[in-house]
């Protein structure tokens, strides 16, 4: 890094200024930047009607979104910078004709591991899903929650986490 002496003169083209500027010793500094990607430990507990789901839809999508934004993942919490914890459960709602309604509530928390401090939390509360049976309506509710996460919450999450 060094000072640009020519920029200090502005629009002046004075030959005297040029002569003086050449005789000045400009301080210089070398700066070494270590660019490091945030390392994430991700845990999840996704359920439908109290039963553990075979696939973790929200956490898988969150992992994909974070990876696309430059985050790396680890299986060891102690080596992580951030801990993302996803908890979600779908509950049975009503039946209207042949349409089954399910409500999904999901909580996503982010903690700084080394400080042991929660830095972000959001809730996707009672996201409504529809289907021809409760299982299909649960999948629909999870899909709508993922859409909400992507479109409404992801930018906020990234802004807070990357500060």
PLM features: what roles do these ranges have?
Residues 52, 76, 93-94, 129, ...:
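Generic marker of "main functional regions" within proteins
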Residues 5, 16, 39, 58, ...:
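Weak global preference for isoleucine
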Residues 1-63, 161-163:
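A structural "domain/chain start" motif
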Residues 64, 78-120, 125-127, 132:
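Surface-exposed short loop/turn segments
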Residues 113-160:
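Short secondary-structure boundary motifs at beta->alpha junctions and helix caps
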Residues 51-59, 101-103, 134-143, 147:
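Solvent-exposed, acidic/flexible segments
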Residues 69-80:
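Short acidic low-complexity segments
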């Amino acid at each position: 890094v060094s000072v640009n002496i020519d920029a200090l003169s502005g629009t002046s083209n004075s030959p005297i200024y040029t002569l003086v500027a050449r005789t000045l010793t400009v301080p210089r500094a070398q700066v070494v930047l270590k660019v490091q990607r945030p390392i994430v430990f991700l845990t999840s507990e996704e359920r439908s009607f109290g039963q553990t789901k075979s696939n973790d839809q929200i956490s898988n999508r969150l992992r994909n979104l974070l990876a696309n934004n430059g985050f790396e993942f680890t299986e060891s919490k102690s080596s992580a910078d951030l801990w993302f914890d996803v908890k979600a459960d779908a509950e049975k709602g009503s039946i209207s004709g042949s349409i089954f309604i399910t409500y999904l509530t999901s909580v996503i928390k982010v903690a700084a591991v080394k400080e042991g401090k929660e830095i972000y939390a959001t809730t996707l509360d009672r996201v409504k899903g529809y289907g021809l049976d409760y299982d299909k309506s649960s999948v629909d509710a999870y899909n709508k929650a993922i859409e909400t996460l992507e479109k409404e919450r992801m930018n906020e999450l990234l802004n807070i986490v990357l500060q």
